[in-house]
Amino acid sequence: MSIEKKILYIQSSVDEEFRLVVNDQWKSTESDHRSKIRNCIEENFTSRFNRQQLAWLNDLNRLPQAEDGFFSIAHCKTLGGFTYSKHPHGFDVEQSSRISTDIIQRTASAKEQAAAPHLSFLWVGKEGGYKALSSTRADLVITDLLCTEWQSHFENQVFSFRLNSLKTLDFGLNKGFIFSEADNLFCIYFK
């Protein structure tokens, strides 16, 4: 199944305006990958920003902030990209083969590991959730997030999940999606 059909499923579930843009020229091993991603955002989403936000977009130490919608950026050794949505969200992409059992054991409870469809889903799910939620709690760490309520949407080759935490967080939509493409795992978590 194509990545486009997986995105259509996410659009129909949460946000028709959701966009995912990835490119292997934006992988983390490319020296200017971060600038290239932001250039693409600027070229294709200019209308979403006011003048000051456009100027800040070129500051690699700032997260992109738009007047109209939200962006999230991710990259790994094979590709990089960004997402856009009307809803606050976090995006992560990882090479499946690089997610180790050790990292899962350090960041996920035994109960989470037993419930997850694939152990590697826990890492990208928590990363996507952390990106979406960390701006509301400065003391938030990955281990504070618990991935729950896994569902398989096999006809779309997508899994969904929700997050819980012992810390008080504003979850709102609280809907995450994970899918794979080649050796890459993608997560989009809507706060």
What is each stretch, according to the model?
Residues 1-191:
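Core catalytic alpha/beta fold that binds nucleotide/phospho-ligands
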